[in-house]
Amino acid sequence: MLNKKDFLKYASTLAFPIMLQNLIGTLVNIADTVMLGYVSQTAMSASSLANQYTFILFCLYYGMATGTSVLCAQYWGKGDKKTVEKILGLAERISLIISLVFFVISFTMPTAIMKIFTNSPETIAAGSEYLKVISFSFVFMGFSQIFMSALRSIGKIMLPSVTYIVSLCVNVLCNATFIFGLFGLPKLGVTGVALGTVIARISEVLICLSYSLRSSDVRFRIKYFFAKSDILLQDFIKIATPAVINDVVWSFANSAFAAILGHIGDDMVAANAVAVMVVNIGAIACRGFANATTIIVSQELGKDRIDTAREYGKRMLTITFIVSLIGCAVILAIRPVILNFYRDKLTETAIYYLGIFIIMTTWRFVGEGINTCLICGCFRGGGDARFGMIVDTIFMWLVAVPLTFLAAYVFKLPPVWVYFVMTLDEFEKMPVVFIHYFRNKWLTNITRDFE
């Protein structure tokens, strides 16, 4: 077992590249939001609401990536490279099927999707065009997300970082080109942002495939993409399915929050879009350490070091909490800068909401960081994805969403207080999460012996 100083160095070598990847992902969203701010508030709101649909798909990918990551990390810790590649092929096949389903729905029924989130005709029209174009990115996004999660799980974290950097550059360049009509091209507005995302996702896949062809570590192999392995499929489903359900339940709840805000008014939607973007910056560090927890715990369990996995999980929880507090301070420090930047881009009411929303969302991501470290890091890394599914289903859909709905439409509270009720969701489930953590039933070695 590493001493605390060496462990911090080890955890940092895993967490910092993940933080960089999260930062780049956030910067992509920032670039989209900032550039759309130059188009119109309607375009910004349309993109934000349309992305609630893609966010559901991303949560499916995240759940599948969790199954991939946990299994790959444990088998890598055991030293079974062949099984790691089989898991990758299996996950990519499932990802492709889901991507195609979401593509067909968003390409053929974009208007119906947008009407779920808003009743503004202008926002519906702009969001529908956005969805039709961005749907072409789904297959590419699924492949790259699964492939890079497998690499991260075995400690190969540089390629995902490089891939995200290239993707960011491609996305920003394409956004600028299509939004502002550079190089003689027409101005495409919100559609241009979607097209830029498609091109960026294609670049990610090209980098992943290029690495796979040359790699001596883990490769994507066509034979494993089509290979049948009932045992691995069973194990993958056992971990990935609860994780997928967990993330879909969580994402649907966030979509329900967005729908509630959307029906209150575009000012709420625009302010929330910027507030979420800002908070994601502050949450990057704590989420990086939380995600590193999965790798660390899984690999130790794959080596059958139960006590070490338990101790490392405890250390990662402490680190994540401290880092989340630092993130709070960063968000509050940059709040005046954000308000000044958007003052001439949003309505006066939206700016008023934004100033309050930024403060409210800071405490939410502290709770999110702790819960993510435990539910997605410790519990899933230990093979227990079922608990997160149960606790999120109960607390999001029987507590958080109903309370927010009641605040908005029954008690008709002012919009700011509706938002406050919405930000309490992470703390409502935290006591139950800690009880499960201290029981230590989540520590499990799930590897098998294959010939």
Residue ranges and their predicted role:
Residues 23, 27-45, 114-121, 177-188, ...:
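Helix-terminus/linker motif at the lipid-water interface of multi-pass membrane proteins
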Residues 44-107, 141-160, 258, 271-335, ...:
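Small-residue-rich hydrophobic transmembrane alpha-helices
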Residues 18, 22, 33-34, 70, ...:
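Transmembrane alpha-helix boundary and packing residues in multipass membrane permease domains
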Residues 65, 134-153, 160-168, 193-208, ...:
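Short runs within selected transmembrane alpha-helices of multi-pass transporters and secretion channels
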Residues 41-52, 127, 131, 266-281, ...:
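Small-residue hotspots at the loop-to-helix junctions and early N-terminal turns
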Residues 1-15, 72-137, 185-241, 297-364, ...:
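Short alpha-helical transmembrane segments in multi-pass integral membrane proteins
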Residues 19, 23, 27, 31, ...:
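Generic alpha-helical transmembrane segments of integral inner-membrane proteins
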Residues 13-32, 133, 144, 167, ...:
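Transmembrane helical elements of multi-pass membrane transporters/channels
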